[in-house]
């Protein structure tokens, strides 16, 4: 026998044993039966036309009257019931970041900035 025939026989047996020439057309994938509900995250935003939002908003006039009445930033934090939450979040940057996203904390920071701007050192 010639050497080329031996190589062809070896190559053929190799292809057969490794199933490289397999005729199996079965796809091994999950079958989709029907539409399924996807769990997507949705971030809700405040409505633009909310009537209560202006009543609860901390505007310049309210901050001015609070400062004239002698309300300190600590007093305002106590009024918003944030003192315990701030103390609890003081050791964790993640907790403080989460607290900073709340409406009450934003109000407190706005009042803090107002007091810092309008109080002489």
Swiss-Prot record:
A motif (RxLR-dEER) lies at residues 38-56. Residues 57-121 are annotated as: WY domain. InterPro entries: PexRD2_WYL. It is found in: Secreted; Host cytoplasm; Host nucleus. Residues 1-20 form the signal peptide. The keyword Nucleotidyltransferase does not apply. Keywords: Host cytoplasm, Host nucleus, Secreted, Signal, Virulence. Changing residue 109 to D: Prevents the ability to oligomerize and the interaction with MAPKKK epsilon. GO terms for cellular component: extracellular region; host cell cytoplasm; host cell nucleus. Induction: Expression is induced during host plant infection. It comes from the Eukaryota. Belongs to the RxLR effector family. Homodimer. Interacts with host MAPKKK epsilon (via its kinase domain). The RxLR-dEER motif acts to carry the protein into the host cell cytoplasm through binding to cell surface phosphatidylinositol-3-phosphate. Effector that enhances P.infestans colonization of Nicotiana benthamiana leaves. Induces a weak Cell death response in N.benthamiana. PexRD2-induced cell death is dependent on SGT1, suggesting that PexRD2 is recognized by the plant immune system. Interacts with the kinase domain of the host MAPKKK epsilon, a positive regulator of cell death associated with plant immunity, and perturbs signaling pathways triggered by MAPKKK epsilon. This is RxLR effector protein PexRD2.
